[in-house]
Amino acid sequence: MRSASSLPGVKSIRALERGLDVLQAVQTRPGARLKDLHEITGLPKATLLRVLRTLTERNLVWQRMADGAYLPSSRGRGPARLDDAGRLVEAASPVMARLCERVNWPSVLARPRDGRMEVIETNRPRSHVPHLPIGPVGARVSMLLTSIGRAYFSFCGHEEREEIVRQLQASAEPGDEFARDPAWLARLVAQTQAQGYGRRDPLYAGDPRGAGRFPDDGRDSISVPIIVSGHVVAALNLTWTRRAASVTQIVADHLSDLRAAAAEIASGLEPADEGGTA
């Protein structure tokens, strides 16, 4: 509800009012889509799109790729916390959009939650294969058998890795039983660190031994960690259909693109240098 003007005779700027109404709607209902904002504000969708574009360009709101939702920007709210998922996704989304344009295959961004990796963003809607079964946001996948879980697990700190192992040892989820095999875990970490990326376990990629436990979705993936100030905060994958390319081919063609994207995301989360003179 707008208050009466304290400056009689001075006209308000209607365009600015519309912009502030939309900004307030996004702030009070983060995750609203265009349809929701249309219902909240009563503004025509064409007007809303122009306002939202302006707010986005001014770094006041941003749009999540996975579902088209609009959220208030976290930029300018002080130093980023390493556990701030919203700021992580905000930093990653434009980078993931550009990655998809370069490589044409989709990616997901995920971080650990309760011994699994939870998808928090995907550029699948921007890819040439939007039907590929990855994500959606909120989906949780295996820590030890997926490439994205392996990338996180193998590059995170020793204490965090031990905590993840303890969680998995108490789990009955398929694949988590490997957490009770120290030699298997040691081989996984050593191999992943040596090659510099996580690779999907064959059980998840058509190996007959996985039949009945892990439905074959016809795809494969590789992943790299996102490291901020020496700490792994998430992992980023690249996924494709196996009939289109081998792991060797994807690594040769696109691993450097994936690493560059992870580094760019990390750079956007690094604390600002507040140096100066005493």
PLM region spans:
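N-terminal helix-turn-helix
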Residues: 1-89, 263, 267
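An N-terminal domain-start capping segment
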Residues: 7-32, 101-132, 138, 256-278
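Amphipathic alpha-helical regulatory segments at dimerization interfaces
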Residues: 40, 91-102, 106-108, 188-191, ...
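Short clusters of small/polar residues that mark proteolytic maturation junctions
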Residues: 65, 122-124, 203, 237-238
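Amphipathic alpha-helical effector-binding/dimerization core
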Residues: 67, 71-169
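Short, solvent-exposed recognition segments
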Residues: 131-215
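Juxtadomain coupling helices with adjacent low-complexity linkers
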Residues: 208, 214-217, 232-278
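A short, aliphatic-rich beta-strand micro-motif
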Residues: 220-226
